[in-house]
């Protein structure tokens, strides 16, 4: 991706005794049950002392969700064009009613929090999630642990975290997770490459599409003609913004004038989440934001909103990312809860996100919870699209569980079964897989039914027998689902025209295509596409051009982010093959065909 991989810059691991003072201590009476813990402390971190007892920490508590499996099956059903309930998206009220936990569960957790000094009136309840703010002193007593300041020895950033936390046994059956506690992370843009010299072009007429990509190149390659989405509030295109990436209106306006003059005057709205800003005169890096708005909106022409979310996440560091910030807020949860709290009429129809992180760098309870929230967006008719990543088979190529096993690294959220993951290609005539396109198989999520036949075919007939055994999970969710161009996109940023590469070009590109397909459906009185994958792997598959040349790479012996030494795997790669493959998915879009297929159901 020029995607922001919430990438985990690496960190070798040291044993727990190296930081025993950070380990949880049973310091209050009563029985507790450990909810989450880290196996080891990452190298590159030092304990710098204890936070002030009065320091404020904001927590999100996820209640156990006994109806998750039934709900997710319902989302699959309403997204399956062969099912009688296809297209019957749920309202906000229907989702909340379906997932509302039993009153005794919520009451028990409320009472537990109140008994530990957290006033009930300060606890915000949102279906099966609770949000509360408390002091370090109270949090330590509540969670039977000790919080410490940790400093990263690479960039000197600090964070307040613990290695383990517990909850009272009386409420343990009701609490799924509480964060931020053990999730150390810092999202960062994963720039596959940004060409620092200015592009000597002023319009699409100056471009060789084998060298530089513009909207006209994409329209020609994917047979889009001059079709744009109508500006319809039912078909809003949402673009995720994190990490103080500001989408500049002047740059966007110039890009449209240069490359899509038929959309002259088109702009986008901005919505702030958790205090997020969209400063127009900042000197901070904004290539990711510029790329996203230029191509998602420049291709679709849809009514669009840039969602700027403040805060940075926390991670279980691995060889990609020992990079942490002192901000306690996790952007995915902040954004997801904001969006799910919107009335149905204000939800985006398509949400494009060009960010990701190594799946292993995120606690399992967290990936499960976040993926389920993506399913809730799908239930309400939102197509959630993520770039697959820019590390090929992997960059760290080592487990971070203390065992240091050499393996490929799947990407989250790209490997969540309820998002559509977009890989990367380059060149035209023929279009081929690009080497950095991330793909593979989840170690957290099992393979969903909609891709069972395709992935099994790849494993049994296209992948050399025994190749890469032990390096990946052959029963995991395969990604990406589809792919699109990802190399040297002409982009306006800070008043310059530059070239940018990454699957974070592929994601907004594909989001623009989906937005136009939604517009076609709405014009024919059909519902929005919503969660795409069951449709893509059934009806939609014939609307994609199979990419059979090229492949990914990775595991080169040097981490591409931290530049630390990593395991070297000679020839590490997934090849583009006939049918689905873990580099390009089902292939690249043929809009001419898709525009007809989209009206069949």
UniProtKB/Swiss-Prot annotation:
Glycans are attached at residues 210, 281, 323, 575. The keyword ATP-binding does not apply. The keyword GTP-binding does not apply. Binds 1 Ca(2+) ion per subunit. Residues 23-202 form a propeptide. It holds the Pfam family Pro-kuma_activ. Ca(2+) binds at residues 546-547, 579, 581. Keywords: Calcium, Glycoprotein, Hydrolase, Metal-binding, Protease, Secreted, Serine protease, Signal, Virulence, Zymogen. InterPro entries: Peptidase_S8/S53_dom, Peptidase_S8/S53_dom_sf, Peptidase_S8_Ser-AS, S53_propep, Sedolisin_dom, Tripeptidyl-peptidase_I. Residues 1-22 form the signal peptide. It is found in: Secreted, Extracellular space. GO terms for molecular function: metal ion binding; serine-type endopeptidase activity; tripeptidyl-peptidase activity. Its cofactor is Ca(2+). It catalyses: Release of an N-terminal tripeptide from a polypeptide. GO terms for biological process: proteolysis. Residues 212-601 form the Peptidase S53 domain. PANTHER family: PROTEASE S8 TRIPEPTIDYL PEPTIDASE I CLN2, TRIPEPTIDYL PEPTIDASE SED3 (AFU_ORTHOLOGUE AFUA_3G08930). Secreted tripeptidyl-peptidase which degrades proteins at acidic pHs and is involved in virulence. This is Tripeptidyl-peptidase SED4. The gene is SED4.
């Amino acid at each position: 991706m020029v995607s922001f991989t919430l990438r985990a810059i690496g960190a070798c691991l040291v044993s727990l005794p190296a930081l025993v003072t950070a380990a949880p201590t049973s310091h209050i009476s009563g029985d507790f049950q450990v909810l989450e813990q880290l196996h080891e402390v990452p190298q590159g971190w030092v304990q710098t002392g204890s936070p002030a007892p009065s320091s404020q920490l904001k927590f999100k508590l996820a209640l156990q969700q006994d109806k998750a499996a039934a709900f997710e099956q319902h989302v699959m059903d309403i997204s399956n064009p062969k099912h009688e309930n296809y297209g019957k998206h749920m309202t906000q009220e229907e989702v909340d009613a379906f997932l509302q936990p039993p009153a005794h569960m919520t009451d028990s957790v409320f009472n537990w929090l109140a008994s530990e000094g957290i006033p009930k009136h300060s606890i915000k309840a949102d279906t099966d999630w609770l949000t509360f703010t408390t002091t370090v002193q109270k949090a330590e007593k509540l969670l039977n642990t000790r919080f410490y300041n940790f400093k990263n020895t690479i960039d000197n950033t600090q964070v307040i975290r613990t290695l383990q936390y517990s909850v009272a046994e009386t409420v343990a059956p009701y609490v799924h997770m509480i964060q931020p506690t053990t999730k150390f992370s810092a999202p960062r843009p994963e720039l596959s490459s940004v060409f620092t010299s200015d592009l000597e072009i002023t319009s699409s007429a100056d471009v060789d599409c084998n060298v530089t990509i513009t909207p006209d190149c994409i329209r020609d390659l994917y047979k889009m003609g001059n079709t744009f989405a109508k500006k319809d509030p039912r078909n809003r295109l949402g673009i995720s913004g994190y990490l103080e990436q500001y989408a500049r209106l002047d740059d966007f306006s110039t890009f449209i004038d240069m490359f899509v003059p038929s959309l002259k005057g088109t702009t986008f709205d901005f919505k702030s989440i958790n205090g997020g800003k969209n400063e127009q005169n900042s000197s901070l890096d904004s290539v990711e934001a510029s790329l996203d708005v230029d191509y998602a909106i420049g291709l679709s022409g849809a009514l669009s909103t840039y969602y700027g979310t403040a805060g940075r996440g926390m991670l279980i560091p691995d060889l990609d990312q020992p990079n942490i910030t002192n901000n306690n807020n996790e952007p995915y949860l902040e954004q997801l809860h904001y969006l799910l709290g919107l009335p149905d009429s204000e939800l985006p129809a398509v949400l494009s996100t060009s960010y990701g992180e190594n799946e292993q760098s995120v606690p399992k309870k967290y990936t499960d919870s976040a993926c389920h929230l993506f399913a809730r967006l799908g239930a309400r008719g939102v197509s959630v699209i993520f770039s697959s990543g820019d590390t090929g088979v992997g960059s760290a190529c080592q487990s971070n569980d203390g065992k240091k096993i050499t393996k490929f690294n799947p990407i989250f959220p790209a490997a969540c079964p309820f998002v559509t993951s977009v890989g990367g290609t380059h060149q035209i005539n023929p279009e081929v897989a690009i080497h950095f396109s991330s793909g593979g198989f989840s170690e957290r999520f099992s393979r969903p039914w909609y891709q069972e036949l395709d992935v099994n075919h790849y494993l049994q007939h296209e992948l050399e027998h025994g190749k890469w055994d032990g390096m990946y999970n052959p029963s995991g969710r395969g990604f990406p689902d589809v792919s699109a161009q990802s190399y040297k996109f002409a982009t306006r940023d800070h008043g310059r025209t530059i070239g940018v590469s990454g699957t974070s070009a592929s994601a907004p590109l594909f989001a623009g295509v989906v937005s136009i397909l939604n517009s076609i459906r709405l014009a024919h009185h059909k519902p929005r596409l919503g969660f795409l994958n069951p449709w893509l792997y059934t009806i939609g598959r014939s609307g994609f051009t199979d990419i059979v040349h090229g492949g990914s790479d990775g595991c080169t012996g040097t981490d591409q982010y931290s530049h630390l030494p990593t395991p070297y795997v000679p020839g590490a790669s997934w090849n583009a093959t006939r049918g689905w493959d873990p580099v390009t998915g089902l292939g690249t879009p043929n809009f001419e065909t898709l525009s007809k297929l989209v009206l069949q159901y």
